[in-house]
């Protein structure tokens, strides 16, 4: 089961500057990757004479990347590139947002995964909308670009982040490409999986996700032992079962009386102050 330990980082600290810089890099990379995906999507529906300069530029990047791929790939008819394909395009063309100075490579790869996941979610939503449009408020829209000067959440893996313990028994998490650390206290709930860094109302929240490696108990698919619960007012709960155990009735009148007294006292206090 997964657990998270959250730490908030205020402005004016070196750790905040690290978070802010990388969140801007993540934002720029998301827009750059989405731009290439969208250009390939629109170009797949056009003839060579109808292509725009942006579409031609991106198609040139794709063709250049294909020359360096160990296993040749082709762009699907929809024009949507998979994560692996998109990663190769950004990598082999030495994209400046992908290789932004100080931006961890695993964080960059996770941003590309997020772009492809957002597009896959869009196509799934469109497919469902075509079948059951009444379940939506409107036709699903393509993922939008993020604010040009904005920030966005980025994720670092446990290959870049490490959990350490001091001589006093305190735990902390080291982060990639910085000497700053995240203090976690006297205990951690398991094995570190990944670290999420999210902008939040002028601060940053660092969420360390752990796996306690305890298997979640799956509910039984057999419905042999069942209980029915009917909540009410005078009868707070009526509980019946097919297990041969006594049925239960919980009297709700005492709680109802307490609630009425509470409401009366609140009304008296409000009337005295108005």
Name the predicted role of every residue range.
Residues 1-274:
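Nucleic-acid substrate recognition interfaces
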